[in-house]
Amino acid sequence: MVSQVVAEEKPQLLSKKAGCNSHGQDSSYFLGWQEYEKNPFDPVSNPSGIIQMGLAENQLSFDLLEEWLEKNPHALGLRREGGGASVFRELALFQDYHGLPAFKNALARFMSEQRGYKVVFDPSNIVLTAGATSANEALMFCLADHGDAFLIPTPYYPGFDRDLKWRTGAEIVPVHCASANGFRVTRPALDDAYRRAQKRRLRVKGVLITNPSNPLGTASPRADLETIVDFVAAKGIHLISDEIYAGTAFAEPPAGFVSALEVVAGRDGGGADVSDRVHVVYSLSKDLGLPGFRVGAIYSANAAVVSAATKMSSFGLVSSQTQYLLAALLGDRDFTRSYVAENKRRIKERHDQLVDGLREIGIGCLPSNAGLFCWVDMSHLMRSRSFAGEMELWKKVVFEVGLNISPGSSCHCREPGWFRVCFANMSAKTLDVAMQRLRSFVDSATGGGDNAALRRAAVPVRSVSCPLAIKWALRLTPSIADRKAER
């Protein structure tokens, strides 16, 4: 009897926050990860395991980072350059949570260099955070009260449902984008989302975009950014531009990466009407492939936002030894320039390997020019063109094919049949294994054969009516013959 009473009272010992289900862990995005962790692929010890294609992690250029560390042992050894005195004591003691000046200066220069110095970052406007997740949440706390809303173009990164909402109480209102124009953001779509928020009696505080897009793998065209900036200026709201994939954009200008701050600076009067309401989130997780270091940043020209975010950053600081190491690494300009160029080349090469492999088995992708993933159209493999059909296909791909990919519904895409497929967290050989598995699945699903009809359709399947998509396809994706010649 006593144990029964205790059992009934236990839930009351936790807060409502601890017991709520808004964290998003029940999303298929996270469920796929759980299945992978139960049965991870290994080419030697577990060759039939699940291949992780749901993780946007850059493992393509670790050798370059390790080579630099071997040449610069002082950085890891916590000594002055040239084998000088130890800095262990000063780093181990309490630090100002504004961050080490040497690191903030190096980070500001690196961010400016990534954008071709079309935007120059002021170190005093940078707030350091424990990754981009902390940066985005801190901005939510700074800009929105409980129940306020941010508009986010779809499809969007599934983790935003956790990062932006769970602890802050903020709401997300999707800006619905469609494959007909390559999922580009339009003013009518923004206006529609704003009206829907008003009908729900939500106060819209801003728009949040990822540029380059996660999950689309596309850098936002300047015209789209101008549309978004015009919208936030007209509504008197904020814009958060999550630019953590800025250094992965492998297309040459004008199809390459354009920062929201560059668009703001190009407005009449230097963007004075909106410059204090446009904020950038950055991290070193994607461009340098260092997610475990937990290094993120908020950049804002709004002094009040910088002050508030700095106070909040005390709950998620970047460790002093990490800052010291990265100050040395980012301070080596010759290295960072060569690293970024080579890393982009490797990303494009692996991207092309995935796109070519999918095309050969009759699966098309949205043409992309950035990121660590492709937005893949597998709708023709579904038994029904519905979200139930999408989930049925997803389960087959995870459990039968052994590939963890992310279904579009987890990214709030309105069109069933799209999937995010990552390519930079595995070797080329593992990607080949994934394509072999998928080919076998497609052959069995379509009755075998050479899938010639499917290959002709994969160009991409639902975006061929968009002139921009065709232009990107011709510019960014080499022919299969070219890829084989390179190999």
Curated annotation (Swiss-Prot):
Top-level taxon: Eukaryota
Keyword field contains S-adenosyl-L-methionine: yes
GO BP: any one term: ethylene biosynthetic process
Pathway terms, separated by semicolons: Alkene biosynthesis; ethylene biosynthesis via S-adenosyl-L-methionine; ethylene from S-adenosyl-L-methionine: step 1/2
InterPro entries: Aminotransferase_I/II_large, Ethylene_sulfur-biosynth, NHTrfase_class1_PyrdxlP-BS, PyrdxlP-dep_Trfase, PyrdxlP-dep_Trfase_major, PyrdxlP-dep_Trfase_small
SUPFAM superfamilies tied to this protein: PLP-dependent transferases
The keyword S-adenosyl-L-methionine is annotated on this UniProt entry: yes
Keywords associated with the record: Ethylene biosynthesis, Fruit ripening, Lyase, Plant defense, Pyridoxal phosphate, S-adenosyl-L-methionine
UniProt-listed Pfam families: Aminotran_1_2
UniProt-listed Enzyme Commission number(s): 4.4.1.14
Induction: Induced by partial submergence. Induced in leaves by infection with the fungal pathogen Magnaporthe oryzae. Induced by phosphate deficency.
Positions carrying N6-(pyridoxal phosphate)lysine: K286
Needed co-factor(s): pyridoxal 5'-phosphate
GO molecular function terms listed in the Swiss-Prot or TrEMBL record: 1-aminocyclopropane-1-carboxylate synthase activity; pyridoxal phosphate binding; transaminase activity
Subunit structure: Homodimer.
Functional description taken from the UniProt entry: Catalyzes the formation of 1-aminocyclopropane-1-carboxylate, a direct precursor of ethylene in higher plants. Involved in defense response by producing ethylene at early stage after fungal pathogen infection. Involved in several phosphate deficiency-induced adaptive responses, such as lateral root elongation.
PANTHER family: 1-AMINOCYCLOPROPANE-1-CARBOXYLATE SYNTHASE 9 (PTHR43795:SF10), BIFUNCTIONAL ASPARTATE AMINOTRANSFERASE AND GLUTAMATE/ASPARTATE-PREPHENATE AMINOTRANSFERASE-RELATED (PTHR43795)
Homology family: Belongs to the class-I pyridoxal-phosphate-dependent aminotransferase family.
Protein name as annotated: 1-aminocyclopropane-1-carboxylate synthase 1
Source species of the chain: Oryza sativa subsp. japonica
